[in-house]
Amino acid sequence: MKRTFQPSNTSRKRTHGFLVRMATKNGRLVIKRRRAKGRKRLSVSIATK
């Protein structure tokens, strides 16, 4: 049986990325909550060299 988590940076970014969050009202609320909580990472960001 195939495992449920098949990692892919592309789909990860397209679903949970910053621009996707900012596109909707609720997404902006997510960012706002994470800012208030003091999260280091507000959304998924793929580390690049």
Curated annotation (Swiss-Prot):
GO terms for biological process: translation. One of its GO terms (cellular component) is ribosome. One of its GO terms (molecular function) is structural constituent of ribosome. The keyword Ribosomal protein applies. The keyword Ribosomal protein applies. It comes from the Bacteria. Keywords: Ribonucleoprotein, Ribosomal protein. Coiled coil: none annotated. Gene3D superfamilies: 1.10.287.3980. Signal peptide: none annotated. Pfam families: Ribosomal_L34. InterPro entries: Ribosomal_bL34, Ribosomal_bL34_CS. Belongs to the bacterial ribosomal protein bL34 family. HAMAP family: Ribosomal_bL34. This is Large ribosomal subunit protein bL34.
